[in-house]
């Protein structure tokens, strides 16, 4: 049995100490890191509870329950940040990415502790694939919210649409992982390629401007 709350305490404690020492400018980054790991912890409990209540098998829990729960949980601290602090548009995407990458980091650490780290190639691909998938979902949601929350009439509909897009991407990723075989490695490579393609496109647009 893996006591993930103990893992959370061990990982969050240094971040909290660093947040107190680094000053107000860097405080937001560390708080978003802790929030990302915290919602990952809560997502694990909620996934387990819903899987038990719905009597879902492993495939249903992975492809149907987990994407919805995890993407909604990642959205909660971001929506709180938007409602309470009303940040400028250029601060929304970094916040979403920070939450996503800390979520992925905590998830990978828990996976390593539970399943071992003896298969380097598999862990290597999983680390990059899972991290890129969560960051890609964060880019979709964060980049979209930076646009929609500047327009009052788009806030609710835009947020729901972006959440749906992130859930769909997450579900496809998990479904390919659950299928196993070559599809599993395709799913690990796909988010990395999409992030790389998006970055290259952004660089080209910047050079043209």
Protein language model annotation of sequence segments:
Residues 1-209:
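Hydrophobic alpha-helical segments at protein termini of multi-pass membrane proteins
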């Amino acid at each position: 049995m893996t006591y993930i709350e103990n893992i959370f305490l061990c990982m969050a404690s240094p971040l909290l100490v660093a947040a107190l020492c680094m000053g107000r400018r860097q405080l937001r980054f560390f708080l978003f890191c802790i929030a990302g790991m915290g919602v990952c912890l809560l997502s694990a409990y909620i996934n387990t509870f819903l899987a038990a209540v719905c009597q879902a098998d492993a495939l249903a829990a992975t492809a149907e329950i987990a994407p919805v729960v995890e993407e909604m949980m990642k959205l909660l601290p971001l929506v709180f940040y938007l409602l309470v602090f009303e940040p400028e548009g250029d601060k929304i995407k970094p916040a979403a990415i920070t939450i996503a990458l800390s979520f992925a980091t905590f998830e990978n650490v828990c996976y390593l502790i539970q399943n071992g780290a003896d298969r380097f190639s598999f862990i290597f691909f999983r680390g990059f694939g899972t991290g890129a998938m969560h960051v890609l979902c964060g880019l979709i949601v964060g980049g979209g919210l930076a646009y929609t929350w500047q327009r009052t009439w788009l806030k609710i509909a835009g947020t729901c649409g972006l959440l749906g897009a992130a859930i769909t991407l997450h579900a496809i990723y998990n479904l390919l992982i659950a299928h196993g075989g070559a599809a599993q490695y395709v799913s690990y490579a796909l988010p990395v390629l999409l992030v790389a393609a998006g970055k290259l496109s952004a660089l080209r647009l910047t050079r043209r401007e």
